[in-house]
Design a protein with these regions (language model features):
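Conserved N-terminal phosphate-binding loop of PLP-dependent enzymes in the Aspartate aminotransferase
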Residues: 1-149
């Protein structure tokens, strides 16, 4: 949520999904999941009692989600991402230009990756030894997902 510079990535493309899920970022560390749909879809697909959950309605989780959404708006997180993301893009593009084994930068906002010609496990391990945390996405992509704030 917010990582691409919009609250949800679909907002970059001029479409509105009929159904969407949200989870991890919605709780900012508190386990939560949400299944959202338009009223039009809900009217045609769900009746009372069709969709239930063991933990649904938990007040603690509800309060956490409320605070996360409040913080996202209050602290202008999406605007901040739009402001700082070009720096990450520029630096990753510079790395791709500098090293032949890097073939391209992918992603948007503060969810970026660089594609490598070979598996990246050793690179991620060496980066960690040097104090840089990167994760892999598949066998040949280094993913960079810095904090939103």
């Amino acid at each position: 949520m917010g990582r691409t510079g919009e609250m949800f990535a679909w907002q970059h493309y001029g479409v509105k999904p009929d159904i969407m899920t949200s989870a991890k970022a919605l709780g900012c560390g508190v386990p939560v999941g949400a299944f959202l749909m338009t009223e039009r879809v809900a009217e045609k697909s769900l009746a009372p009692g069709d969709h239930g959950t063991t933990y649904g309605g938990n007040p603690f989780v509800g309060a956490a989600v409320d605070k996360v959404l409040e913080m996202m708006e209050r602290d202008h997180i999406t605007e901040h991402v739009k402001k700082v993301a070009p720096y990450l893009e520029k630096k990753l593009d510079e790395l791709v230009a500098k090293y032949d084994f890097l073939t391209e930068r992918r992603g948007m906002g503060l969810m970026q990756g660089v594609v490598c010609e070979k598996p990246v496990g050793q690179i991620a391990a060496k980066a960690l030894e040097a104090g840089l945390i990167v994760i892999t996405a598949g066998s040949n992509v280094l993913r960079f997902v810095p904090p939103l704030i």
